[in-house]
Design a protein with these regions (language model features):
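N-terminal signal peptide c-region/cleavage motif recognized by signal peptidases
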Residues: 6-8
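Metal-centered catalytic cores of metalloenzymes
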Residues: 10-63, 67-164
Length: 164
């Protein structure tokens, strides 16, 4: 008897974001603190999010997945994420994305916004990008390492130049 191992027809895509402080104005500086890392998997239309955050100046109150018009741009919430009402903890959630939301994810338009008591309109923010190597600040890297260019539609590096 011969047994063949079959790979799934569609492999899951991995994404990540580092969520960090995003003060809306100079008065919020001391209140907008903390950091986090979030990993996500897209399996067809199921988007599963797992991550951690820490260092908030006050307890978290809510976290949501959003879709903006561009990477770095803001937009409406897609849905709520699970978080503890604490200064540190885990972030999680599972969403069924629409085709437009899947396309937005692939263009870097989906992001997380975590609110806290001292920054109720966004304490930590981060836009999802394809999973990539990250290293500590000041660590040199060799070779092709930069985040894929989402603008050329290939997700494989700098936009290609055409001679035609």
């Amino acid at each position: 008897m011969i047994i063949f191992a079959m790979a799934p027809a569609f492999a899951a895509d991995n994404y990540q974001t580092d969520i960090g402080p995003t003060p809306k104005n100079g008065r919020q500086g001391a209140n907008v603190q903390g950091r986090g890392t979030v990993l996500a998997t897209l399996d067809r239309t199921t988007f599963t999010i797992q991550g951690k955050f820490a260092g908030l100046s006050s307890p978290a109150t809510a976290a949501r997945l959003h879709m903006g018009n561009v990477m770095g741009g803001t937009g409406p919430a897609i849905g709520d994420l699970n978080i503890p009402q604490a200064k540190s903890g885990e972030i999680s959630g599972t969403f069924t994305l629409t085709p437009a939301q899947v396309a937005g994810l692939r263009l870097g338009r989906l992001y997380i916004m975590l609110d806290s008591q001292s920054a109720p309109k966004g304490n930590l923010w981060g836009w999802f990008q394809p999973a990539h190597v990250t290293v500590p600040e000041g660590t040199p890297q060799m070779g092709h390492w930069y985040i894929p260019n989402l603008l050329d539609g290939q997700g494989d590096g700098p936009a290609k130049k055409s001679n035609s």
